[in-house]
């Protein structure tokens, strides 16, 4: 049996037992949760074709149960993403607050279009520890073209 086959079998066996290569229990330290597939932009490069919401997005109860399981497993941080997570802002704010209660650091990845002073304050108050906003080019015109936005980046 070749080395490649043996390695593959080892990886499968470790995956099925939930242990890493050194036999230690695997913990999902950082989890990214796409709270919706819906998006307010139509980026040229989007792999998700994020236009409409998932037909069966998690309810608040289902999401908090999943967060409980993450906390039990030792997850340290949960990144809310999408689509655009701020299209479900109230949902994200409640989940962020819940994350704090169970000891998970909440963060968010957003296109930033929906953030203003009020939203930034709400995110801070809910306990969101970090917000990632991708910038696709140092040139505002190219960034806006890639993101398919009408309002220039410099005016936001």
Language model segments and positions:
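N-terminal pre-core extensions flanking Radical SAM catalytic domains
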Residues: 1-50, 68-71
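Radical SAM/AdoMet-radical enzyme domain recognition
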Residues: 57-80, 88-156
């Amino acid at each position: 049996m070749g080395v490649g086959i043996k390695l593959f079998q080892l990886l499968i066996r470790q995956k099925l037992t939930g242990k890493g290569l050194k036999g230690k229990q695997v913990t999902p330290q950082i989890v990214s949760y796409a709270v919706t597939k819906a998006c307010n932009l139509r980026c040229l490069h989007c792999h998700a074709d994020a236009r409409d919401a998932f037909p069966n997005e998690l309810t608040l109860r289902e999401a908090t149960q999943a967060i409980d399981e993450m906390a039990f497993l030792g997850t340290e941080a949960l990144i809310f993403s999408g689509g655009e997570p701020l299209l479900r802002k109230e949902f994200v704010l409640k989940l962020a607050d819940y994350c704090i209660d169970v000891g998970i650091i909440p963060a968010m990845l957003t296109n930033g279009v929906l953030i203003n002073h009020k939203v930034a304050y709400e995110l801070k108050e809910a306990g969101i520890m970090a917000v990632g906003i991708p910038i696709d080019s140092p040139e505002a015109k190219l960034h806006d073209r890639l993101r398919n936005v009408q309002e220039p980046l410099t005016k936001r």
